[in-house]
Design a protein with these regions (language model features):
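A structural signal for short, hydrophobic/glycine-enriched beta-strand patches
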Residues: 1-124
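A transmembrane-helix-recognition feature enriched in membrane-embedded lipid enzymes
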Residues: 118-138
Length: 138
């Protein structure tokens, strides 16, 4: 997920979607959220997309299985696993915000950051964590 900055030709989501497809990740495992402008919005909008896709998938599956005489377990017994692909310095905050908005089974998948800029990113991220904790996003 991720919107488009003023100096960017494509949304972050679109760029990552194309990258994941080029690496062989199938369409059914990807969702495209291009509206967010912050990590908090990323998680809120992504949760909405995941919830809607899962509702449609389960309704379709429930109907098909009912025709065969099978039942699905109740929705509350289904656990949806979500992976957050982000920078190594950003993983802690992204997972914390995801949990706060109700994405409980979340795993971080972190990419290594530029070692020259890593300290700068970590300092900036510390302030972002403090801000998100203060406003209740984490």
């Amino acid at each position: 997920s991720g919107g488009q900055g003023d100096d960017e030709d494509v949304t972050e989501a679109s760029a990552m979607y194309r990258y994941m497809k080029s690496r062989g990740v199938p369409d059914y495992q990807l969702l495209l959220e291009e509206s967010s402008r912050s990590t908090y919005e990323n998680m809120v909008y992504s949760k909405m997309l995941i919830t809607e896709r899962e509702r449609i998938r389960r309704a379709t599956l429930r109907a098909a299985m009912a025709e065969s005489g099978y039942l699905l377990p109740p929705d509350e017994e289904i656990v949806i696993r979500v992976g957050i692909l982000t920078s190594n310095f950003h993983e802690l905050r992204a997972k914390g915000i995801a949990r706060q908005v109700g994405i409980s089974n979340v795993s971080g998948i972190s990419a290594t950051s530029d070692p020259v800029l890593f300290v700068h990113f970590c300092v900036r991220e510390c302030f972002a964590i403090l801000k998100d904790k203060f406003v209740g996003n984490m």
